[in-house]
Amino acid sequence: ELYRELTQDIMGLNVVGMFGFPMPSQPFGWFKDADVTSVQDIQGLKYRTVGLAADLLQEMGMAVAQLPGGEIVPAMERGVIDAFEFNNPSSDSDFGAQDVAKNYYLGSYHQASESFEWLFNRDMLESLDDDLQAILIHAVEAASTSNTASALDRYSADLQSLQTESGVTVHRTSDEILAAQLEAWSTLIPTLEEDSFMRRVMESQKEWVERTVFYELMNQPDLQLAYDHFFPGRLNM
């Protein structure tokens, strides 16, 4: 309902939108330096990101440059930036991230989740018979499920390729940096909530997360424990 309110009432768009293809957390990104473990290590670091993440990482002391994707590699080559994030192992490798940096830090709260949206012209959709509307809705759900599974397969395969074929070292972002990101969000969120609609969105998200993630954390067994059991020594975190 909040999404409908945003697109139709606030933005005045003649559309019906549906979310789909929930994507995992974006990596913290690519760094020339292999030793990025503390908040002090990123102070003043020239770093490419965009959107709300730019505000977040500026709050943490990084020198943020909001560059389009096509300018990332040239900017790294010229020393305009020292590090960058883009999206995921597949998208990153497609544009040659591995050619300008060899240290890839996974795990970050700068964009912990995202999803695609399917937009239909509202007049067109509502003019269709109920069965045809249902076909489109189920097609979105099917595409969402398929893309989620395909992405997990491709991202993991491309990450492995980056390590074995391109000499990339994969790191897990340190708890110190992750905790600092959360503190920075706690500073930024009250400013975002000054907008009444955004405040209702945040309240809805918090209510959902409090309930669903509680269940997930209580019910899901420790994946790292199982991974270490069956693949001892594979993780280097």
Name each region found by the language model.
Residues 8-237:
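N-terminal secretory/targeting leader peptides
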